[in-house]
Amino acid sequence: MKKTLLSLLLTFFALCSYAQVDLSYYLPSGYTYDEAIPTPKEILGYEVGEWHVSHDQLVMYMKAVAEASDRVTFEETGRTYEKRPQVMLTISSPANLAKIGQIKADRKKLRDAGASVDIAKMPIVMFMGYSVHGNEPSGANASLLAAYHFAAAKEIAGDLDNMVLLLDPAINPDGLNRFASWVNTHKSYNMNGDPNNAEFNEAWPRGRTNHYWFDLNRDWLPVQHPESRNRVRVFQEWLPNIHLDFHEMGTNSSFFFQPGVPARNHPLTPLKNYELTKKIGTYHAKALDQIGSMYYSEEDFDDYYYGKGSTYPDVQGSIGILFEQASSRGHLQESVNGMLSFPFTIRNQFTANLSSFQAAKDMRQELNQFMKDFYKDIQKEVDSDVNKAYIFGSKEDDARSYHLADLILQHDIKVFSLNDDITVNGKEFQKENSYIVPADQPQYRLIKAMFETRNTFKDSLFYDISAWTYPMAFNLDYMALNSQILNLASVNEITKSSVDLAPGKVIGTAGAYQYAMEWTDYYAPKAAYKLMEADFQVRVATNEFSTADGKVYGRGTLLIGKGESGLDDQAFFNKLVEIAKESTVDIYGLTSGYTGGVNLGSPNMMHLEKPEIALLVEGGVDSYEAGEMCLN
């Protein structure tokens, strides 16, 4: 009995010891820290890794560091769906912080093949993005240590004269907070590492995704969510040389750093990118060796799909680096390698952060020169490419064309609208809803990645998707243009602020016989729901018909009457104007029911009823699919 009790006590104290770490467990030796900079514990009330930091606590600490240090500025870059702030620390020498605008302007010259820039004096920029997957929290918790170290370590003051660090502590604030709430709620002071523990089995939909249960690490290219648009804007403003992306993987694994599988690099990414990534990897290996952590590289993960945080930089002269840490999924969990503690996972991520800093410091000129050469080489590729531009559009739907143009603009790519209609190889592109993207611009490789149709590959296996031709995804007509056709086009450059969807309108007058709305527009379903919500009678044509002015209305056209709304002609008309404007669709007044094809009173006009939708969640429901339904 005494032996059993002793064994239980030893196990208890061993488990407790995993959680009893202080700042010295994480911080490297040989540094002295400015006492004016608050430690995480002084602000949060607990040591890093003792609890999972919530997003509000994370922001609170970042603000405290910025207020205490002349090396750090705090910036809110946007808001999530749940109105949490997306924040970023800019860390550099006070002299650099005083001339941020000039540093950004100089970096833009790296994209200009003809611009002169002094590489020897240019600071290197490193972006550090943590926990885009909210339930991979070692990254966000390591950002506490990174903020403290880079703000307080006295020995790096001189290094910051030549460096700018951009620290985004939580790329997915909503998901991170969801997960922190779960694991902190289920934490026991007497920790149990059994994988069956509730702490490690979070409730649906889990914290990986954002508010609408979307994987934000697949949104760097499509930029469909505010979190993505905000961070892509930061990327395009700064053009970082190194872009760190902190993740987690299965509990029984170790630690991964890029490069990934060599055969699965995207062909548009130059070989030099892989070579530099591998060179930086030697810094990670050395640092992880020093703390005795296991690791691997060049397996499992790849650098193909440009919509991920570690590959989006690769097509823009930057070095994207993925880190994958075996996940404790809570505070302490059994693994095939022994007990895996949350503090251990945080320490590995922070160590890789420090090794990246050292690589950036040592390779500053080399990486700035690489970016400059990257864009110089692009000009040679542009000159040899027979495709000088891409044109896309839809005669039936302004909205889809607009949304693709808007997407492309987010990536610092020039887009032009047409002044006149143009016909290319028998295909007409109308000036109202067509756009041209010239190839001869710095983002040539990214443009090519968006528009090309690639169907031959070195490897038959992929970590992610292998094709993403954007005009096809938007169901648009598109073509590549040669120089002769491009020179014939009359165009105007558009900007984020100048391009917008035109409001819809009602073409006709109050008191029309009926009103018609075509189903070809992207926002037609939105308008249809609003019409039924207003108690209007809505019918759908199952055969086409035509009016006296020769206009043909296809299958799927909606016919709209007052129904049971109780409105007079003018009030009914005014409501239609409101719905058309809000939904950006056009509604047409019809003067007679005697139409070509089927008449408006035909049995082929089927009545629609407003749908009452029940969305199933939890259980066996895929959260990605459910989230997509919620968003739409």
Predicted segments, located by residue:
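Bacterial Sec-dependent N-terminal signal peptides
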Residues: 1-23
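Carboxylate/His-rich catalytic cores and anion/metal-binding grooves
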Residues: 147-150, 162-190
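Active-site-proximal loop/turn and secondary-structure-junction residues that shape catalytic pockets
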Residues: 171-173, 248-250, 327
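Aromatic- and acidic-residue-enriched carbohydrate-binding clefts of CAZyme catalytic domains
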Residues: 195-214
